[in-house]
């Protein structure tokens, strides 16, 4: 996993799995603490996401909601959206609407 932060957006690349969950949690919670509004997690360049990571993102969103904001996923692939739905985590993690290719 590689990451970069641009104001309220955490941009991730690579694979998100159990091996990077602790590091990702530390980075994300730090961003939640210092961001006055919603935090966006951009996973548009992520190769794969596992259930451990999605559960951690759901808990991070719950923590953010206590402070009046949210953790919002951006750039979810069809596979990630399907996994969120099948795992019943979709209601626990806000997801930006998919951009339509013909909207450009």
For each feature predicted by the language model, list its residue ranges.
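STAS-like cytosolic regulatory interaction modules
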Residues: 1-52, 58-104
């Amino acid at each position: 996993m590689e990451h970069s932060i641009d104001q309220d957006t955490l941009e991730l690349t690579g694979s998100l799995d159990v091996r990077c969950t602790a590091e990702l949690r530390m980075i994300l919670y730090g961003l939640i603490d210092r961001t006055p509004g919603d935090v966006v997690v951009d996973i548009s360049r992520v190769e794969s996401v596992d259930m451990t990571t999605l559960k951690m993102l759901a808990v991070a969103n719950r923590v953010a909601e206590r402070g009046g904001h949210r953790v919002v996923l951006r750039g979810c692939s069809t596979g990630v959206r399907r996994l969120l739905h099948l795992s019943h985590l979709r209601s626990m993690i806000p997801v930006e609407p998919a951009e339509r290719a013909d909207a450009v």
